[in-house]
């Protein structure tokens, strides 16, 4: 519990957190904090891709996106996919670094116990970057993560569970009535 409270405090201070999941490490920052998102973008060498937005519950979706009933259904699937949805105009509480050149956000809900607990403490939108599409260097343990993310990550939230394999999130986008 203490580690979760400290991790939440790190995020509230506008810093970068690495969370160890069964699928690898995930970089996390508050979605409203521009400075850590700029640091993450500089680290990744990527300036245009949307950064995935994790929301605490389905009720929060409408505050940030214009989402269809079908997209809402997809985002609530057990596999916790990313769903590309149109940004709601006036979503001022998000940093412009979330989708600097686009009109869409990749949104998701917590897909693991660690993120459910973290979101329960914060109840704030999070920017979450995993190794989806090989956007992040791969680290299979804490020692490697410290080396790979040196100078970027301010705190690591880890568990004693091993990283089993790198499993990228599924990205779903509605095109007409179809899911792609």
What annotation goes with each model-predicted range?
Residues 1-180:
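Active-site-adjacent structural elements in enzyme catalytic cores
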